[in-house]
Amino acid sequence: MTLLTASSRAAARLLGAKNSSCIIFAARHASTSTNLKDVLANMIPKEQARIKSFRQQYGSTVIGQITVDMLYGGMRGMKGLIYETSVLDPDEGIRFRGYSIPECQKLLPKAPGGAEPLPEGLFWLLVTGEIPSQEQVNWVSREWAKRAALPSHVVTMLDNFPTNLHPMSQLSAAVTALNSESTFARAYSEGISRTKYWEFIYEDSMDLIAKLPCIAAKIYRNLYREGSSIGAIDPALDWSHNFTNMLGYTDTQFIELMRLYLTIHSDHEGGNVSAHTSHLVGSALSDPYLAFAAAMNGLAGPLHGLANQEVLVWLTNLQKELGEDVSDQKLRDFIWNTLNSGRVVPGYGHAVLRKTDPRYTCQREFALKHLPKDPLFKLVAQLYKIVPNVLLEQGKAKNPWPNVDAHSGVLLQYYGMKEMNYYTVLFGVSRALGVLSQLIWSRALGFPLERPKSMSTDGLMVLVGAKSV
């Protein structure tokens, strides 16, 4: 059966009937091969031809305008790069290759007896644009298990980090050290053809994703479990299950939560700090280890990956001040006090979204199913009813609705993972699925070195005809 999405129908109309056969990510027969690299090798020439045709016809078309405020405002809303794996709609939220989170939850393969999608399936979708079969997902699970072992120098490095070194710093350093294993770096030094770049980027990306749970688990065990062993990878288990086992958690609900968490945090289009960083560094032909390590340094920033930690701190302070069973009016007063003191309510608002984040919604549904009476969840649910109205009354927020960070920490706390400093590491492991999928395609499509033009304030004033003051 051939599938055609709404966006792809629009693209087909734009290109005209004679070129519509090139819309391979929109109208296609699902691949039957279980080897992801083989599937990619078949797709890439068709996608290259599609983009070549599109650029030949529309390369000079103007797609927007840039204002002075955009330059000073972090380039918000500026259309400036191609990112294939996901698109963030202000009203609908994230779509992975055109599929919403509820659709992914329904369509992606599950573990035996499980209800949440396997991240392996999401990775296949991000790379190929196709919903994988159970056999294809099982192939990815086995492939990652086979590639998971860490080189001895990385193990030694992790075991000798000081305990006061932040978990994200440890993650970034360990990933950088894996650069010694890069097949792309070796192949590039040997002068491989540009048309082969993607093959080695693929191999490095698969290796890195496979090894990340081992790195992350060692960091956790060294910091919080007295350096106890992470154990061995079980090739019969999926990626998330192995990860939770290595962390030391065996609760089946927590394993399901990890599958959901690693799926929904994987990608959020290309303009966020971690995704853009990996894209930028990768454009210099740095290998995936270096590009991803750079992305993790961005994710470690408090304005990007530390938000769920800030939510928990705020919730904890709220409980200490008001107690666990608090009235709606007292909550309203507390929220107003937070806002009137010049602070924000953490976990609410988003740079792009203008509705409730669907990543929040699916975590809320998980909590309603598995921990409806948990005091911290009940507080989060109560805030969901109150905070948006207060923010609307205040009149400053463009988006008064909760984002993913308003909920994720609460779920981790419930299942016993209390170490808030570690949460961003989980975010990082998940984000690898998205940014490395795109990195493969960036090299397959021959994207050049990213080099935008910068301007000084004086130069900008001259450009717009303003008088210098």
Swiss-Prot record:
GO cellular component assignments: mitochondrial matrix
Pfam families documented for this protein: Citrate_synt (PF00285)
Annotated transit peptide: 1-31
Annotated SUPFAM superfamilies: Citrate synthase
Reaction catalysed by this enzyme: oxaloacetate + acetyl-CoA + H2O = citrate + CoA + H(+)
GO biological process: carbohydrate metabolic process; citrate metabolic process; tricarboxylic acid cycle
Translocase found in the keyword field: no
Binding positions (oxaloacetate): R359, R431, R451
Location in the cell: Mitochondrion matrix
PROSITE patterns: CITRATE_SYNTHASE
Keywords in alphabetical order: Mitochondrion, Transferase, Transit peptide, Tricarboxylic acid cycle
Entry's Gene Ontology molecular function annotations: citrate (Si)-synthase activity; identical protein binding
Keyword Mitochondrion: yes
InterPro entries recorded: Citrate_synth-like_lrg_a-sub (IPR016142), Citrate_synth-like_sm_a-sub (IPR016143), Citrate_synthase (IPR002020), Citrate_synthase_AS (IPR019810), Citrate_synthase_euk (IPR010109), Citrate_synthase_sf (IPR036969)
Domain of life: Eukaryota
Active-site residues (renumbered): H304, H350, D405
E.C. code: 2.3.3.1
Function: Key enzyme of the Krebs tricarboxylic acid cycle which catalyzes the synthesis of citrate from acetyl coenzyme A and oxaloacetate.
Note: Citrate synthase is found in nearly all cells capable of oxidative metabolism.
Family (UniProt): Belongs to the citrate synthase family.
Subunit structure: Homodimer.
PANTHER family: CITRATE SYNTHASE
Protein name: Citrate synthase, mitochondrial
Upper classification of the organism: Eukaryota, Metazoa, Chordata, Craniata, Vertebrata
Record gene name: CS
